[in-house]
């Protein structure tokens, strides 16, 4: 019997968090190659530390994308995030790029040839999840943890009042109380943010961020019993990769469902959409969201499994957490028929061979609005009617 009354906590980190800086750079490289050649293959890792950025990995793409281009794009990404401090400045950082050709052994298993369809780029398991806790069909704790930081970043970049005193590096954490299985209030708020004005103390920072936090959360969720922890260690001036080294792919729970659903372990950023770590996780979210949007369940978890060089998923698993109106085994069969879940099928259905990934690198890959150019296409609910009809 699932619990109905409990507390659940999720965290998010801002675009200026060291690991997110690296995710942004890796996905900027992915976008550069996909813009030049939609079938490009990439596995790109980034390390960022004091005054230094290192980009390494494997690429199969056009020579028209030069290292000089990538260095300029990297500096522009860091500038957009907002780093102009002595230990990490977009203009002065040393940028080293070490990209080489994709392994021929991997390519022969992944490439389509003759009657062989394009295979998965690796083995692995991927999960998708949806819940009717927010209009975006996301778990409430992670959705609002993201929203707090996104709103603060937007205000900082727009230099709105005292928000201009904040720095790019920040973390949030939201504890939500559930009653009868529904989110009803926030019991704890944690917000740590870099500040450029060294004279600010915790109370000063709270005065800046509190209005944005209150606006980001549903009305009535914050009350006199809510406990606030704003910059609980005091001063937070040295931030970003100058304070802690960053790496691509270290915030996989922040990127997904904040711990409310299982995770297969594969990161997203730096990978082209032939990599099922990314594309199949997007497909699983797309299916789960459409199941909930169709009214077939209040919560849905979907697992997909792949083997390198094999085009079709090895298995699909559906868990509706006791909230479903349909048989889960029957739904599994319907989902397999509703969408081609081969790597090529996913990329085609969701139009993934586009430069749409840098924007995913912060504030979550899920729960975002589908965009006109194909960004966040996996958040569409255009499959809901088909699923509902198939199970009527």
Curated annotation (Swiss-Prot):
Q: Which BP terms in the Gene Ontology apply to this protein? A: one-carbon metabolic process; S-adenosylmethionine biosynthetic process
**What EC numbers are recorded for this enzyme?**
2.5.1.6
Catalyses: L-methionine + ATP + H2O = S-adenosyl-L-methionine + phosphate + diphosphate
Entry GO terms, CC: cytoplasm
Has UniProt tagged this entry with the keyword Thylakoid?
no
Pathway(s) the chain acts in: Amino-acid biosynthesis; S-adenosyl-L-methionine biosynthesis; S-adenosyl-L-methionine from L-methionine: step 1/1
Q: Where does L-methionine bind?
A: 58, 102, 244, 275
Q: In the record's cofactor note, how is the cofactor described as bound?
A: Binds 2 divalent ions per subunit. Binds 1 potassium ion per subunit.
Q: Which GO terms describe its molecular function?
A: ATP binding; magnesium ion binding; methionine adenosyltransferase activity
**Keyword set for this entry?**
ATP-binding, Cytoplasm, Magnesium, Metal-binding, Nucleotide-binding, One-carbon metabolism, Potassium, Transferase
CC cofactor: Mg(2+); K(+)
Quote the Pfam families the UniProt record gives: S-AdoMet_synt_C, S-AdoMet_synt_M, S-AdoMet_synt_N
Coiled-coil annotated spans: none
Binding-site residues for Mg(2+), renumbered to this chain: 19
Top-level taxon of the source organism: Bacteria
At which positions is K(+) bound?
45
Function field:
Catalyzes the formation of S-adenosylmethionine (AdoMet) from methionine and ATP. The overall synthetic reaction is composed of two sequential steps, AdoMet formation and the subsequent tripolyphosphate hydrolysis which occurs prior to release of AdoMet from the enzyme.
Protein family (similarity comment): Belongs to the AdoMet synthase family.
Protein name per Swiss-Prot or TrEMBL: S-adenosylmethionine synthase
Organism from which the protein derives:
Methylobacterium radiotolerans (strain ATCC 27329 / DSM 1819 / JCM 2831 / NBRC 15690 / NCIMB 10815 / 0-1)
Q: Which gene encodes it?
A: metK
């Amino acid at each position: 019997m699932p619990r109905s009354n409990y507390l659940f906590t999720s965290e998010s980190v801002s675009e200026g968090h060291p690991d997110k800086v690296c995710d942004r750079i890796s996905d900027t490289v992915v976008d550069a190659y996909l813009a030049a050649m939609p079938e490009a293959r990439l596995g790109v890792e980034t390390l960022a530390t004091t005054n230094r950025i290192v980009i390494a990995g494997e690429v199969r793409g056009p020579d028209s994308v030069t290292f000089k281009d990538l260095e300029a794009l990297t500096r522009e990404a860091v500038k957009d995030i907002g780093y102009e401090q002595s230990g990490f400045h977009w203009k002065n950082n040393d940028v080293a790029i070490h990209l080489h050709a994709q392994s021929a052994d991997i390519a022969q298993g992944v490439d389509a040839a003759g009657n062989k369809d394009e295979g998965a780029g690796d083995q692995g398991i991927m999960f998708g999840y949806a819940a009717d806790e927010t209009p975006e069909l996301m778990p409430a704790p992670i959705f609002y943890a993201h929203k707090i930081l996104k709103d603060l970043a937007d205000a900082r970049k727009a230099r709105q009042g005292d928000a201009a005193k904040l720095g790019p590096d920040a973390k949030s954490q939201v504890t939500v109380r559930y009653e009868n299985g529904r989110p009803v209030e926030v019991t704890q708020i944690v917000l740590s943010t870099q500040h450029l004005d060294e004279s600010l103390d915790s109370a000063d920072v709270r005065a800046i961020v509190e209005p944005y936090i209150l606006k980001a959360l549903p009305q009535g969720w914050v009350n006199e019993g809510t406990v606030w922890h704003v910059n609980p260690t005091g001063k937070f001036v040295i931030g970003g990769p100058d304070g802690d080294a960053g790496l691509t792919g270290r915030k996989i729970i922040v990127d997904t469902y904040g711990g409310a659903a299982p995770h297969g372990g594969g990161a997203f950023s730096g990978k082209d959409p032939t990599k099922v770590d990314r594309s199949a996780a997007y497909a699983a979210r797309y299916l789960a969201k459409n199941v909930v949007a169709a009214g077939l369940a209040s919560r849905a978890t979907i697992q997909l499994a792949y083997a390198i060089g094999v085009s079709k998923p090895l298995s699909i698993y559906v868990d509706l957490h006791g909230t479903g109106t349909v048989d889960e085994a029957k739904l599994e069969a319907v989902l397999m028929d509703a969408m081609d879940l081969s790597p090529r099928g996913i990329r085609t259905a969701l139009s993934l061979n586009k430069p749409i990934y840098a924007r995913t690198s912060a504030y979550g890959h899920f729960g975002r609005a589908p965009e006109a150019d194909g960004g966040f296409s996996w958040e569409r609910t255009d499959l809901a009617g088909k699923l509902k009809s198939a199970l009527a």
